[in-house]
Amino acid sequence: MLVLFVATWSDLGLCKKRPKPGGWNTGGSRYPGQGSPGGNRYPPQGGGGWGQPHGGGWGQPHGGGWGQPHGGGWGQPHGGGWGQGGGTHNQWHKPSKPKTSMKHMAGAAAAGAVVGGLGGYMLGSAMSRPLIHFGNDYEDRYYRENMYRYPNQVYYRPVDQYSNQNNFVHDCVNITIKQHTVTTTTKGENFTETDVKMMERVVEQMCITQYEKESQAYYQRGSSMVLFSSPPVILLISFLIFLIVG
């Protein structure tokens, strides 16, 4: 028994002193001409530890720290500081740009919609350009050939802000021609005196149509309010509510 114990103890001592061929963090990361025959050299010359395809530490494809594919700090794909991909990538946890909601992008200008930046003016619905005779063949033909260049919508304010139709139409014509001229001029198209003359006639007719439409809607709303605010109607509605609740 004593002899067996001594032999076992001697074998353990020899195992501890025996150098290991590679392994994690052994042999150093040497470049060509600086390594020993089994060290961690680059280019690879064999003799690496377990999991070392090219003579690096455990999990080191080309020699470097744990989790380093090409050498560098922890989490560095190509060298650099923590969370830096070789200085070419954005830093970790950089907040992404907020996505624009589709709700904020939707909605073209609708009839009666308030136009921003025009001081409370609204944009009317599209109309067919009226057929107008200007008294001579040249202008009539010119209008037919160029009517598509003129507005088919008008800008206006609510009718209750004007004392009469003439004031509404005058303001409507001025703001509509001004906006259309500025918008079209920025696109490189200019208007002649003939164009302005014809636009005034066309837009005037459209503003009159818009006034009649808005006036009718305004009076209908007023009539509805008067109807529902009259005492008999209020009494009838109250009685119906009492029957439903009771």
Swiss-Prot record:
The region called Interaction with GRB2, ERI3 and SYN1 is annotated at: 16-223
Chain sites annotated for binding Cu(2+) 1: 54-56
Q: Which membrane topology describes this protein? A: Lipid-anchor; GPI-anchor
Disulphide bond pairs:
172-207
Record-linked SUPFAM superfamilies: Prion-like
One Pfam entry name: Prion_bPrPp
**Annotated binding of Cu(2+) 3, by residue:** 70-72
User: Which intervals carry biased composition (Gly residues)?
Assistant: 45-88
The lipid modification GPI-anchor amidated serine is placed on 223
Q: Where on this chain does Cu(2+) 2 bind? A: 62-64
Segments for region (5 X 8 AA tandem repeats of P-H-G-G-G-W-G-Q): 44-84
Residue stretch(es) of the prosequence: 224-246
Q: Which GO terms describe its molecular function?
A: copper ion binding
Disease involvement: PrP is found in high quantity in the brain of humans and animals infected with the degenerative neurological diseases kuru, Creutzfeldt-Jakob disease (CJD), Gerstmann-Straussler syndrome (GSS), scrapie, bovine spongiform encephalopathy (BSE), transmissible mink encephalopathy (TME), etc.
Q: What is this protein called?
A: Major prion protein
